[in-house]
Amino acid sequence: RSRGLGDVYKRQDLTQRAIHVQKTIIRKLADRESCVIIGRSADYILKEQKPILRIFIYSPEDVRIQNVMKSHNFSAEDAKMFITEKDKRYHKRHLALTGSNRGDRHNRDMLIDSSLLGVDGTAELIEEVAKKVFHE
């Protein structure tokens, strides 16, 4: 079945509604209590919120490929394709919402390469930084 312009508009409208709902939920959570929000362009949505700690966590491509191979039982080639497609979707969504590139250091307080300390070590580092930033 071919898709007409009506289908395109419906999908765009649905995407915009989903983004609006996400923004509303994220703002309500942040207004209600201290919270950690992973992804969803929350750094942009909460840019006026104070205090805030905006962190971008990344790892080198080879580490990401190994993680996906292990977690999804993919070949290296399939893992790389999976990561590429996922990144494209995330970047496209973030750019449409914010006008900036995902991972842009100018919109972050910290960038952390999680391959240096691993998942637990990265979480511990963030916890320590948050305690200092929020004086806890």
Regions found by a protein language model. Name each.
Residues 48-71, 76-86:
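Conserved phosphate-donor/acceptor-positioning beta-strand/loop module used by diverse small-molecule
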Residues 1-9:
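Single conserved hydrophobic/aromatic residue that forms the stacking wall/gate
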Residues 40, 44, 61-62, 74, ...:
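Long, contiguous binding/interaction regions
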Residues 10-47:
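Glycine-rich phosphate-binding loop used to anchor ATP phosphates in small-molecule kinases
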Residues 44-49, 103-105:
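Short loop/helix-cap segments at secondary-structure boundaries that form the rim of catalytic
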